[in-house]
A protein has these predicted regions:
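Conserved HxN/HPN-centered segment at the entrance to the catalytic loop
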Residues: 115-134
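Activation segment signature within eukaryotic-like protein kinase domains
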Residues: 178-179
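A conserved short helix/loop substructure at the end of the activation segment
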Residues: 300-312
Length: 328
């Protein structure tokens, strides 16, 4: 779309559905998004000739940080269509992560997320969107807004209503079916030489309209010395552990409640990344099938063999899936 000049009068008209009109109000208009801290509620961002009304900064809870504000991620209204969109602006950060003895350098890459948005166009298990350059050649991503809750929230809600055994037989089989579809989505990325880069249980949203499990947030990339897909695979393992346990099974909680299995646990039974979480769930819940527990133990501190490819994980998950009765 050709770039247009938007007068203050036109912007007043376009935003009237969402903003109360104030005499003499003037919008701040940005075509260069480099300084994303300056872009605030009620401002206008113009991307490729399309005006967006900025609403709020996105927030995200992670590792106990409730509603951590992400100043480079803006909730907005596409003033052409009236649809809510997420605008991700360019923000660079790096950090190191360790899995066992392997260290990974992680960094944000807008270019990588733009590639993935092109790659996964119309695939149902992925958040959709597109990328565009602003006037300063920043790669901005314009993303659909998915109405729904995270997979983590879904499990927490279930955990307030039933015991684990009831959950495992009544809810887990369907959750496993959807999880496998998500893993198939990651396999698709890997088959095309790409990685998700930040696989977490709160990076799967359950679409309120379709019930579809959908991956979000593809901007992290990983520098690797060994298996380029290893970081994604460990993320998938952590999610599976959470799903199978109806939440994290934490050693300190077991000890505090004087759980009968606590004295049977050894160092090899814990999660390879989070050493306070139990990977060997069969020691806690005897009815966990061996086929599932074998998968979980690939992500334990005592593991000697790891998954190299998502296809290996999917094959083992299919075996677990086949052990549950088919729903009518």
């Amino acid at each position: 779309m050709a770039s247009l000049d938007f007068s203050q009068e036109l912007l007043q008209e376009l935003t009237s559905k969402w903003l109360s009109q104030k005499p003499g109000q003037r919008f701040k208009v940005y075509k260069d998004t480099t300084d994303f801290f300056r872009i605030e509620y009620g401002d206008i961002v113009i991307l490729d000739g399309n005006p967006f009304l900025i609403r709020h900064n996105a927030k995200e809870g992670r590792f106990g940080l409730d509603d951590e504000e992400k100043f480079w991620v803006k909730r907005s209204i596409d003033l052409r269509s009236g649809m809510t969109k997420i605008i991700k602006l360019v923000f660079h950060e790096t950090f190191n992560a360790r899995i066992g003895e392997i260290e990974f350098e992680c960094f944000r890459s807008p270019r990588k997320e733009a590639r993935i948005l092109n790659l996964i166009k119309d695939l149902p298990n992925f958040m959709q969107g597109y990328s565009v350059q602003d006037d300063h050649e920043n790669i901005v991503r314009v993303l659909e807004f998915i109405y729904g809750i995270s997979l983590a929230e879904h499990i927490r809600e279930i955990a307030t209503t039933m015991k684990h055994e009831a959950y495992f037989y009544q809810c887990f089989p369907k959750i496993l079916d959807n999880y496998i579809l998500c893993v198939e989505g990651i396999r698709f990325l890997h088959d095309h030489g790409e990685k998700h880069g930040d696989i977490r249980r709160d990076h799967i949203l359950i679409d309120r309209e379709s019930g579809q499990y959908r991956w979000i947030d593809y901007d992290y990339n990983v520098r690797h010395r060994e298996n380029m897909y290893g970081y994604d695979l460990f993320g998938l393992g952590n999610i599976l552990m959470y799903l199978a346990g109806m939440g994290d099974i934490v050693y300190q909680d077991l000890k505090r409640s004087d759980h009968p299995s606590v004295d049977k646990l050894i160092e090899d039974d814990v999660n390879i990344v989070f050493h306070n979480r139990i990977a060997n769930l069969k020691k806690i819940y005897f009815y966990i099938p061996d086929s599932l527990n074998r998968i979980l133990m690939h992500f334990s501190k005592g593991a000697h063999v790891f998954y190299d490819y998502t296809t290996q994980l999917i094959d083992d998950l299919r075996e677990v899936q086949s052990s549950f009765p088919k729903s009518a």
